């Protein structure tokens, strides 16, 4: 039998991270409405049904996309069964992402598809038609479930339906009905053979009818076989004639094949003639083209001479480019010398810049020294002020907490402490006095109980417990009632005194807590004031003065930092300018050194190079104009443009010369090709004459083909007629064979049905008798188990009787203490609830499942105090008597805690539901 071991919930409704360890015995899950108690049972139900829960579509917590339920169960032998379901929110509902079953550390299911079958097999529920419904009615009972079950016990038809579901009787009835619907075979007329719901006489009549049909089919098979043999003989004669005609057709087809080969040869010869004629035309075309090209050789040689004259100007273009390159280099040297001379002029301000930079750096060092000193003073004062502010804030917070309404209020803390000491002493004295009074009342009650025992044990000769005199029976009973009533009153008074004492001690404990809080606040206040004095502040006014001085230091620091920034910027600018001047002078000297010019000769060298550049430029312009005239270039933008156009013109001349050379070479080649083409044309003409003679011969042979084809067609038509006749015979034979096979199949099916008919009828009768026996056995077991459970409680209902009425309805009668029957409607509501509980326990034992726990959701809801106390006492008795290994009750009534072995308190906070268990 499996009981609950551990439950873990991750993001399940209001439970974000909940773990509960269950133990055997009576477990009470207590909490206010909406705290999340019922979610615990819903999660257990979801794990073992499987995946059935009242609010499955919203089981995952809000603002969460995934959730997880882990349930561990332990068997009587100590085997651990672990069920883990991982949920995911998808669309508008909740889907099971993974469903894992682990037994003794071995995984036996990991997908939702295999989860259901495995959990039913492990928990012994595979024989039930609807295990989920059974668990919800008899294992995990929702709010109002016991009352509903008590009402079902009074309704014979509904009770029958419930027992049918638990026993699986509906499946047995369906199995019996299925035997009647099973097709045992097919009769020879094609109708299915079934038992249905026929009587024995009708079943025997049906058997004889089926046997006669089988014999009739056997006669039809013999007649069809005789006709099939006649058709086979006729078919053999037709096939012999067809073979003779096929031999003649093959000879004709062979002759036609030879003629078709000749036709192909004729086509090939014709194609070769066309090919040779096309080849001759191509040769003539190429010959005419070659002759036209040969005629243009003289014009090409004249044009080649003109182009060679222009190509000789390439040397002058190269000379002009060289002069331009020399002029460009001279211009670059002039530019470099001119730039170096200008930079040397500017670098004369270098000493002035160096002096200004050193002065700015000295001022910057002085400013940084002042900033460092002021920063040190500011940091020390800022630390003292910050610590002082924090201490003053804490002092105010402590004073505010101390002056709160539930501590000191407007009184001084010392006065409140003195008053609390007095009140606590009074409450403790009062509690001791009340304890003494309660003990005295308990002792008096025990004395009365002892006297009552003496009266009851004395039997017929009762004596007065005070004087020992013999009492008449009526007087003895009156005294016993008086003692019993007085003892009950004294016990009640003792409990009230004990409750008052406990209340006084609780109040004293609360006041002691309040006193300790005030003492802690006073100690904290003294520590804070001492810390303020250690910082050098005797009063808050000293702190305000320090804050004003701190602001002045901050303003002074800001002014010094602004001065520092301006001086740093000035130093950077002067340094950059100094570096730039030094670099300019260095670069100028490097340029002059690279050109081999001394610093003092730079100006004179600049004038000399300028004069040389102008002279070279005039020479270059003269040569460029002459070249443009000879090449025919009329317009150009610059010397570079002229050189580019001259190079393009010379490239065009070179290309045209190359093309002319190629054309001249081609013309010489064409002269040789023309002679070759004339010879090829003569050879093609000879081959044409030979092919035309062969074509004439082939056409004469091919003309015989039409006569042979006519005879072949005649033979083929005769063969087609024979094939058609053979096909008709084959179809008729096929139909006969099919019909014979069908009749044999019908005969075999009928014979098979005859073999199964009588055994199936006997099986149906046996199953009907087994169902009735099992049902009567279940009712007897339920009655015995319920009476055994009820005998353990002191109830007005001593037992029950369960009987089957007409129309298969179940009636439950209550048996009073005097042995008289009582209808369930006359039984009190509390006793009907106990009957429902005993029915659930008896049904679980009769079904034989492997779940050893019972869970009830709010069973005490809508009950008055007396009925609630009675029900809880019964639940406690069920646990103590061992009628169920583990009883879990979810309720919002706090008084249930006094009866439970394990108490789990469920509370709801902003962070979700919390569960704290006391064992």
From Swiss-Prot:
Residues 208-268, 315-379, 414-458, 486-515, 541-595, 635-749 form a coiled coil. Zn(2+) binds at residues 464, 467. Its cofactor is Zn(2+). The keyword Ubl conjugation does not apply. The keyword Endoplasmic reticulum does not apply. Binds 1 zinc ion per homodimer. Transmembrane segments: none annotated. InterPro entries: P-loop_NTPase, Rad50/SbcC_AAA, Rad50_ATPase_archaeal, RecF/RecN/SMC_N, Zn_hook_RAD50. It comes from the Archaea. It holds the Pfam family AAA_23. GO terms for molecular function: ATP binding; ATP hydrolysis activity; zinc ion binding. PROSITE patterns: ZN_HOOK. Keywords: ATP-binding, Coiled coil, DNA damage, DNA repair, Hydrolase, Metal-binding, Nucleotide-binding, Zinc. Part of the Rad50/Mre11 complex, which is involved in the early steps of DNA double-strand break (DSB) repair. The complex may facilitate opening of the processed DNA ends to aid in the recruitment of HerA and NurA. Rad50 controls the balance between DNA end bridging and DNA resection via ATP-dependent structural rearrangements of the Rad50/Mre11 complex. Homodimer. Forms a heterotetramer composed of two Mre11 subunits and two Rad50 subunits. HAMAP family: RAD50. The two conserved Cys that bind zinc constitute the zinc-hook, which separates the large intramolecular coiled coil regions. The 2 Cys residues coordinate one molecule of zinc with the help of the 2 Cys residues of the zinc-hook of another Rad50 molecule, thereby forming a V-shaped homodimer. This is DNA double-strand break repair Rad50 ATPase. The lineage of its organism: Archaea, Thermoproteota, Thermoprotei, Desulfurococcales, Desulfurococcaceae. The gene is rad50.
């Amino acid at each position: 039998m499996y009981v609950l071991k551990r439950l873990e919930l991750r993001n399940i409704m209001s439970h974000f991270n909940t773990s509960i360890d269950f133990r055997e015995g009576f477990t009470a899950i207590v909490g206010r409405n909406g705290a999340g108690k019922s979610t615990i049972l819903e999660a257990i139900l979801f794990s073992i049904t499987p995946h059935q829960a009242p609010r499955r579509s919203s089981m995952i917590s809000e603002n969460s996309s995934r959730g997880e339920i882990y349930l561990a169960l332990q068997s009587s032998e100590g085997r651990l069964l672990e069920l883990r379901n991982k949920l995911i929110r998808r669309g508008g509902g909740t889907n099971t992402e993974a469903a894992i079953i682990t037994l003794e550390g071995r995984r036996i299911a990991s997908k939702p598809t295999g989860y259901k079958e495995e959990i039913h097999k492990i928990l012994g529920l595979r024989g039930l038609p609807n295990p989920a419904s059974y668990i919800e009615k008899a294992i995990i009972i929702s709010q109002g479930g016991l009352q509903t079950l008590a009402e079902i016990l009074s309704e014979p038809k509904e009770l029958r339906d419930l027992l049918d579901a638990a026993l699986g009787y509906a499946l047995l009835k369906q199995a019996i009905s299925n035997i009647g619907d099973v097709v045992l075979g097919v009769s020879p007329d094609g109708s299915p053979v079934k038992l249905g719901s026929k009587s024995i006489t009708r079943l025997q009549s049906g058997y004889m009818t089926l046997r006669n049909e089988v014999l009739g089919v056997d006669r039809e098979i013999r007649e069809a076989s005789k006709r099939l043999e006649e058709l086979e003989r006729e078919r053999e004669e037709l096939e012999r004639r067809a073979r003779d005609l096929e031999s003649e057709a093959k000879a004709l087809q062979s002759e036609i094949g030879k003629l078709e080969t000749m036709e192909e040869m004729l086509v090939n010869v014709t194609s070769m003639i066309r090919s040779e004629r096309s080849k001759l035309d191509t040769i003539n075309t190429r010959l005419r083209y070659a002759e036209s090209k040969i005629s243009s050789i003289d014009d090409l040689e004249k044009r080649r001479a003109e182009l060679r004259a222009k190509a000789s100007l390439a040397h002058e273009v190269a000379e002009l480019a060289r002069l331009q390159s020399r002029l460009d280099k001279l211009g670059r040297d002039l530019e470099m010398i001119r730039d170096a001379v200008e930079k040397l002029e500017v670098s004369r301000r270098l000493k002035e810049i160096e002096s200004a930079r050193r002065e700015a750096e000295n001022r910057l060092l002085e400013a940084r020294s002042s900033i460092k000193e002021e920063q040190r003073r500011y940091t020390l004062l800022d630390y003292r002020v910050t610590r002082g502010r924090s201490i003053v804030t804490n002092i105010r917070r402590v004073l505010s907490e101390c002056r709160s309404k539930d501590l000191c209020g407007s009184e001084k803390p010392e006065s409140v402490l003195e008053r609390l000491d007095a009140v606590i002493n009074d409450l403790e004295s009062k509690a001791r006095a009340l304890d003494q009074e309660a003990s005295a009342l308990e002792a008096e009650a025990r004395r009365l109980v002892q006297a009552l025992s003496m009266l009851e044990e004395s039997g017929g000769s009762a004596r007065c417990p005070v004087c020992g005199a013999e009492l008449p029976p009526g007087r003895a009973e009156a005294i016993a009632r008086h003692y019993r009533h007085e003892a009950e009153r004294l016990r009640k008074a003792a409990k009230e005194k004990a409750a008052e004492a406990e209340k006084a001690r609780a109040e004293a404990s609360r006041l002691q807590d309040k006193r300790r809080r005030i003492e802690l606040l006073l100690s904290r206040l003294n520590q804070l004031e001492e810390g303020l004095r250690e910082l050098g502040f005797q009063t808050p006014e000293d702190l305000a003065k320090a804050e004003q001085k701190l602001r002045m230091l901050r303003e002074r620091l800001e002014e010094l930092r602004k001065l520092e920034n301006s001086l740093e910027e000035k130093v950077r600018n002067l340094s950059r300018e100094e570096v730039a001047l030094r670099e300019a002078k260095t670069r100028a000297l490097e340029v002059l050194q690279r050109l081999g010019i001394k610093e003092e000769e730079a100006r004179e060298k600049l004038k000399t190079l300028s004069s040389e550049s102008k002279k070279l430029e005039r020479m270059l312009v003269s040569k460029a104009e002459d070249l443009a005239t000879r090449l025919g270039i009329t317009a150009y933008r610059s010397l570079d443009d002229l050189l580019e156009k001259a190079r393009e013109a010379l490239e065009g001349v070179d290309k045209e010369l190359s093309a002319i050379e190629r054309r001249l070479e081609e013309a010489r080649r064409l002269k040789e090709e023309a002679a070759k083409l004339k010879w090829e044309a003569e050879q093609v003409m000879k081959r044409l004459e030979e092919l035309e003679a062969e074509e004439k011969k082939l056409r004469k042979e091919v003309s015989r083909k039409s006569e042979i084809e006519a005879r072949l067609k005649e033979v083929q038509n005769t063969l087609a007629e024979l094939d058609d006749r053979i096909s008709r015979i084959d179809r008729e034979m096929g139909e006969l064979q099919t019909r014979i096979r069908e009749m044999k199949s019908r005969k075999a099916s009928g014979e098979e049905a005859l073999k199964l008919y009588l055994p199936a009828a006997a099986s149906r009768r046996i199953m009907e008798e087994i169902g009735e026996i099992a049902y009567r056995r279940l009712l007897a077991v339920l009655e015995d188990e319920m009476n055994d459970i009820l005998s353990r409680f002191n109830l007005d209902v001593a037992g029950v009787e369960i009987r089957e009425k007409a129309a298969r309805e179940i009636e439950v009668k209550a048996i009073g203490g005097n042995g008289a029957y009582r209808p369930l409607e006359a039984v009190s509501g509390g006793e009907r609830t106990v009957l429902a509980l005993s029915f659930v326990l008896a049904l679980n034992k009769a079904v034989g499942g492997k779940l050893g726990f019972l869970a009830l959701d709010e069973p005490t809801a809508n009950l008055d105090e007396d009925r609630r106390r009675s029900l809880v006492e019964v639940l406690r008795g069920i646990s103590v008597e061992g009628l169920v290994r583990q009883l879990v009750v979810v309720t919002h009534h706090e008084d249930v805690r006094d009866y439970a072995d394990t108490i789990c308190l469920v509370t709801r906070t902003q962070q979700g539901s919390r569960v704290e268990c006391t064992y």
